[in-house]
Amino acid sequence: MQVTVETLEGLERRLNITVPAANIEDAVTAELRNIAKNRRFDGFRKGKVPMKMVAKMYGKAVRQDVMGEVMQRHFIEAIVKEKINPAGAPTFAPVENNEGADLVFNATFEVYPEVELKGLENITVEKPAVEVKEADVEEMIETLRKQQATWTEVEAAADAGSRATIDFVGSIDGEEFEGGKAENFPLEMGAGRMIPGFEDGIVGKTAGMEFEIEVNFPEDYHAENLKGKAAKFSIKLNKVEARELPELNEEFVSKFGAAEGVEGLKAEVRKNMERELKQAVKNRIKEQAIDGLVNENNIDVPSALIDQEIGVLRQQAAQRFGGNTEAADQLPRELFEEQAKRRVVVGLLLGEVIKTEELKADDEKVKAIIEEMATAYEDPTEVIAYYEQNEQMMNNMRNVALEEQAIDAIIAKAQVSDKEVSFNELMNQQPA
């Protein structure tokens, strides 16, 4: 076998491979003999059919099958010989494919980029300095009360804390637009569900009133045809309701299964908030470390890997929205391309960190991750046992631990400082 390697554009490579004719003919002959030996032919005893007849009947198809197998096998031998690491499946193209002559073909594919990590010392990470304060717990308790609140119809004017039930019809330049009409729509005032100015036009109005308001859709509104447009809404206020919060007593506490009364509920709420806070701090640090890693290391990305990741994201999107996963390929590629490329880049860079630092999943870290996750469940010991008895789940956790160790390795070389933030600031912070 003769092999030459061509470097094409970017990460694309082409192998030019020559396979001796004897290899092809020997493989074709062997397969034809196998057919002659094992298949029945009318007028002949099994295994006694003339080879010329078998070759005439099956020779073309057998040669095609042999060529495909030979190209695949010799491609693998070639990449091992040349120490090449393909990032996706090759495209084969025969160049010379005449019976009795050497087979000459090429295989075109992409390779993984050569990654040399740099700039880790330039990465800046602001570690959130935050704790759950008593006021945070009280605010969370108040949120729980609001979730259990009842609404009572009142004759008062609508204000920021009330719920208004309205009919409305929206129009732009006198024309109604899709999605701009509703009847008996319950609107919790102050929740910020509507576009800016909409709720303001309802404040101070009482049930039975009919009126119009004029607002502008934001420039970043999700519907392209409404971005930045001036709109008029005709509104009828059907009902105004006031929120009635439940008493913070034993009856209220019992709804959450907390022991030891109100103080027990507060303790349970604090415990949950501290667990969520710990994860949020970890996520914020990880996000900054990865952003810095990506910004400092610009690498080429194999399109084959991006295509694979787009396929994964399409399937996840279809499952998340209860759609037909078989139709996932119909979802527009543009929806996922940027995220897919980012995932591939991050995966390649973290993989290089793991390789460079010679990291292996730490068993104690794996155990700690599982135990911490199990605290969110009613019976942590049962969850831990489930993971320990499931090898696939354990492998997933080893990968999680390995990624965390890679992040730790980045942080160890980065510029890290503390930044004081409140619980709400951190929890409401949107990922970059």
UniProtKB/Swiss-Prot annotation:
An example Gene Ontology biological process: protein transport
GO cellular component: cytoplasm
Cellular compartment(s): Cytoplasm
Entry keyword annotation includes rRNA-binding: no
Reactions catalysed, as given in the entry: [protein]-peptidylproline (omega=180) = [protein]-peptidylproline (omega=0)
Keyword entries, A-Z: Cell cycle, Cell division, Chaperone, Cytoplasm, Isomerase, Rotamase
Domain PPIase FKBP-type: 161-246
Any one GO MF annotation of this record: ribosome binding
Domain of life: Bacteria
KW Cell cycle (keyword) present: yes
Record EC number: 5.2.1.8
Function: Involved in protein export. Acts as a chaperone by maintaining the newly synthesized protein in an open conformation. Functions as a peptidyl-prolyl cis-trans isomerase.
Family: Belongs to the FKBP-type PPIase family. Tig subfamily.
Comment, domains: Consists of 3 domains; the N-terminus binds the ribosome, the middle domain has PPIase activity, while the C-terminus has intrinsic chaperone activity on its own.
Protein name (record): Trigger factor
Natural source organism: Vibrio atlanticus (strain LGP32) (Vibrio splendidus (strain Mel32))
Highest classification ranks of the organism: Bacteria, Pseudomonadati, Pseudomonadota, Gammaproteobacteria, Vibrionales
